[in-house]
């Protein structure tokens, strides 16, 4: 890595520390702080960092680890608890949203392939931002938070399915569409075959590694398979994120996946922070100034439409008015998975640079607005509506806040110690 690239990364992390501290004081989610860091640097040094290939590579690792952790943490029991919000609410949201975008295709404004793609991009939400706000407000166990999580699980699955379909959708738009379609199909079969083989051998290898008693080997093995599957997926014409997700699912069936999650969390957080920073770095200030009004109108239209659609979706499932409204507002933004889809679609010509800039800017604005909307709508519904079940049980605890501002440090240390204890217990159980 060139010396200048290292200097750039040091400067970015230094700026991120300052911005995150300020964001914490303002009660903002860390993801917003990272995006603001990128926005500041894109204004201060518009050319020094945007062309930095090493930084882009590190941010791609953030995407890889994000999908890896999604696969690793995918829990059938969690799906069972949230099945109503996940499959019914999530599918209704997807159908209604794609129905709206298909209307633009019928008017001849975009192609039908783009209508489907844009529909999937728009339904994605940043639960990292919403859940952080819910956690800070003591609402993490509230009905609207659980509803948001359920719908987000459906969105995660839809992202993975779309990452599989993008090469096939792109093949239809190329001159050599049939041959490209065959190549994509062959690549998917090879990837599926490798996954089937790994399905049987990964748990055996992981068990052997745990029996060695060397914790570092668990981390190295997880990183090796994660990056290995990601690289294989890209070599076969798919995204690295898809391969990482498949690897996470394969390791998920192992009895040791809790300590894999704990041991690799620090890697994920570092690279994921770079991904959010890169979102801000990609902000084109000149484009934003020249197209300010259209971007603002698009942001308002998307957030309003998503709130209404999510409200309708959750009400049809049977959730009460306040839960549906707060869930709709909380995930009305276009989240990080929307960027992942757009980045994957760009090389295939499924989305133009202009469309990427418009949707990307709207996504950034929507994520920055989400905390204020959640707080505002929550206060509004408390003033004019009935309290939620969580509030009735706890009283007005949503206004209370942790007294210890360093509680997250203790939580991190506790997670680390718990991971070590889980590792030792697993090792003792196998040796006994």
Residue ranges, per PLM feature:
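Transmembrane helical cores of multi-pass secondary ion antiporters/exchangers
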Residues: 1-411, 416-424, 431
